[in-house]
Amino acid sequence: MEPRDPSPEGRSSDSESASASSSGSERDAGPEPDKAPRRLTKRRFPGLRLFGHRKAITKSGLQHLAPPPPTPGAPCGESEEQIQSTVDWSESAVYGEHIWFETNVSGDFCYVGEQHCVAKMLPKSAPRKKCAACKIVVHTQCIKQLEKINFRCKPSFRESGSRNVREPTFVRHHWVHRRRQDGKCRHCGKGFQQKFTFHSKEIVAISCSWCKQAYHSKVSCFMMQQIEEPCSLGVHAAVVIPPTWILRARRPQNTLKASKKKKRASFKRRSSKKGPEEGRWRPFIIRPTPSPLMKPLLVFVNPKSGGNQGAKIIQSFLWYLNPRQVFDLSQGGPREALEMYRKVHNLRILACGGDGTVGWILSTLDQLRLKPPPPVAILPLGTGNDLARTLNWGGGYTDEPVSKILSHVEEGNVVQLDRWDLRAEPNPEAGPEERDDGATDRLPLDVFNNYFSLGFDAHVTLEFHESREANPEKFNSRFRNKMFYAGTAFSDFLMGSSKDLAKHIRVVCDGMDLTPKIQDLKPQCIVFLNIPRYCAGTMPWGHPGEHHDFEPQRHDDGYLEVIGFTMTSLAALQVGGHGERLTQCREVLLTTAKAIPVQVDGEPCKLSASRIRIALRNQATMVQKAKRRSTAPLHSDQQPVPEQLRIQVSRVSMHDYEALHYDKEQLKEASVPLGTVVVPGDSDLELCRAHIERLQREPDGAGAKSPMCHQLSSKWCFLDATTASRFYRIDRAQEHLNYVTEIAQDEIYILDPELLGASARPDLPTPTSPLPASPCSPTPGSMQGDTALPQGEELIEAAKRNDCCKLQELHRAGGDLMHRDQKSRTLLHHAVSTGSKEVVRYLLDHAPPEILDAVEENGETCLHQAAALGQRTICHYIVEAGASLMKTDLQGDTPRQRAEKAQDTELAAYLENRQHYQMIQREDQETAV
């Protein structure tokens, strides 16, 4: 690192540079050629410097391993020319390279510090980037400056070679300075008070980007010996692949000795047994150190799944894990990674995507024939996700912390999943008149994990896929897609295109001909089902406990369930019904006499007349999310679970949740009590839901007392308020996996997405009563000179003086709440400028809605003013009332941009979130029209 001026000024600027990475021996790196001898002496200092007055110590340089030699063909200067946004697996990969993503963070100062920041003099705020692996933020122009302060990212691999004779078997911390830090200091247990240092350039914490331990940036909390001590890799050490396992290999040289070896016949025989993938040279090799306590994890993310969820979730995994165990499936698929990690003992896989992504990974594992096959867990993205629902992972990802997901993967149970072969060949008995030019002789997949179906559902799916391929621009909205599905299903129903399905098929299951039974039933759809879930969570097999002819459905019993659907049973399926159970079998021979739409795990096609054989292929090893109690906080004086729990139920609106879910205390204050339920001490959330809904139906319950304010919608869900640093939603499909005692202690919180913000606050004046029920006593200030002013000016003065009682009195007397002054400012503008929350709430409830987007002479709405003044609560009120977040003032700024200029990043992030929500809502409304 470049030495600093020993003066106090020099130390101050050094604290701003904030380079706090721990390193290996810097002496191994050798002196830099442009350094003077005096500086070389200073570099041999044991690596400690004080930050200002009794600030924490730091050591510069690379991380826990000896600095690697420059990669041949990749000089140091060239590596910085290109900003890296993905993990580099080439032989020219840079040691300790950052992985940059775009960010809209504006409050955090540039990590390189003012001394090295080249963007500080620019007139406008320069674009910034954030490293996903160590979470530092720098200006794009300042990325090269990180070399000057010698700060690299946490290392993801180590170098191999004869120089590193004593290769390290442990990982050292990667210390990073933070100007903001959540949680508490590991040494003293006190918080970091980031609320008071938000606009400060002072370093408040030093944290490790591996284990996430954080300390106050002062010598009383962060000791010198902690720089060199081994890192535990944190609470997820069992799933993190240490960088010591990953070696960069040297490309073999064409020496004389090597050429002689190539001529040996035995060598030729050995190499001929290897496939082309296994035999070729790779820049990186894996040398694991097996441990029975470790469950190393590979994460595969499909960024195309779930809108933008996949791309965002990658960044979270890069932070919690080694970046070289996280893979983007759009960059080449899973095969390369599975080949490389095939010898890692006790390996587990996390597939982030839809059921199609899971099937892709399972098929690749089949091709590689890994022994034993690693179990696969699922993080469901998007919609549908029937396999994920079956294995208790839920129907989609909401906002569960990634840290908790990793714990679920580590602790999940290993189960088996039947996989079924599909073999189709043309039906030679079909006549030429049955041929269809648009049909194909091949199925889209030759194996299925979920289901194989033909008839009505396949026809609807096929039309959707064909229309989307022809006009992809018309299918970029989930709402539009659902509308198209509904329209196609309705038109297909009217046309009756699948009503004669039974006349053109023959079904033989385990040697028994079911064709007569099917012809009597006249189904419009037949499903061969492997798992209990189908069509986004429905259960078509149901619970045949009363029917002794059928067994309950399992995904590992080697049997398929054959189900027929009439239009009546298809409609009943969406409200808890089931289809017509035909049989359970191990083998199916299906013959079609004409071209019929079919689908394999959601992939449709129109299959020409064929003979199809379905038989068990193998069993895949999967991870099933377990029901556990270990997430509950443990205390030394913890009491056993009582027989009964008496719990207060409180409801949170979606507006409050999105604005405050990172602030537990404020969100608790914003919640509305619904009542009290008494549940068994060991009850899960599924049972608790039944008690809460019973509370709504009781004559003396909360729903009966105030139906407008307290009646729950059908889409409410539980909130976990205990196991993470913030609130997060619990998927309804996973309620049976969580105990009440895990997510609540004395009070349980639920989120109602259809609850309006105003109804969540009973202390606000209700819109249904235009005037207050009880008169107010005028304040002394309101009594002076009131009669001397016109009514409009009286209203303005009342708004300025925060005199809500006077405002109500004038309104009752016929005052116009839309009155403006000479500069076109409304009463709401004046109330915002003085920070009068009570007046703002009254105006929002009683003034016409046009007041929300009314502009004054500078083009500013009341929301522009509130954002510029950093009035978060008032902004929250105005946004809840329905103000537009996309209106711009005369300078072209939206309210979010005004908050950014005021350097209030939390408010700007909230406004940006609500702005995106408004845009999506507007798009869906336009589509509905």
Curated annotation (Swiss-Prot):
Ranges spanned by the short sequence motif PDZ-binding, renumbered to the chain: 925-929
Substrates-to-products reaction catalysed: a 1,2-diacyl-sn-glycerol + ATP = a 1,2-diacyl-sn-glycero-3-phosphate + ADP + H(+); a 1-O-alkyl-sn-glycerol + ATP = a 1-O-alkyl-sn-glycero-3-phosphate + ADP + H(+); 1-O-alkyl-2-acyl-sn-glycerol + ATP = 1-O-alkyl-2-acyl-sn-glycero-3-phosphate + ADP + H(+); 1,2-didecanoyl-sn-glycerol + ATP = 1,2-didecanoyl-sn-glycero-3-phosphate + ADP + H(+)
This enzyme's EC code(s): 2.7.1.107, 2.7.1.93
Region annotated Disordered, chain positions: 1-46, 59-81, 257-281, 421-441, 760-785
GO cellular component: a single term: plasma membrane
GO biological process terms held by the UniProt record: diacylglycerol metabolic process; lipid phosphorylation; maintenance of postsynaptic density structure; negative regulation of Ras protein signal transduction; negative regulation of T cell receptor signaling pathway; phosphatidic acid biosynthetic process; phospholipase C-activating G protein-coupled receptor signaling pathway; Ras protein signal transduction
Consequences of knocking out this gene: Homozygous knockout mice are viable, fertile and do not display overt phenotype. Slight perturbations of the cellular composition of secondary lymphoid organs with a slight decrease of mature T cells is observed. Upon TCR activation the normal conversion of diacylglycerol into phosphatidic acid that negatively regulates TCR signaling is partially impaired. Hyper proliferation of T-cells and the ability to mount a more vigorous and effective T-cell response against pathogens indicate a more profound T-cell activation in these mice.
Basic and acidic residues bias spans: 1-14, 25-37
Annotated keywords: ANK repeat, ATP-binding, Cell membrane, Cell projection, Cytoplasm, Kinase, Lipid metabolism, Membrane, Metal-binding, Nucleotide-binding, Nucleus, Phosphoprotein, Repeat, Transferase, Zinc, Zinc-finger
Cellular compartments annotated: Nucleus; Cytoplasm, Cytosol; Cell membrane; Cell projection, Lamellipodium
Quaternary data: Interacts (via PDZ-binding motif) with the PDZ domain of the syntrophin SNTG1 and that of SNX27. Interacts with IRS1 in the absence of insulin; insulin stimulation decreases this interaction. Found in a ternary complex with IRS1 and PIP5K1A in the absence of insulin. Interacts with PIP5K1A. Forms a signaling complex with RASGRP1 and HRAS.
Protein name from the UniProt record: Diacylglycerol kinase zeta
Protein's organism: Mus musculus (Mouse)
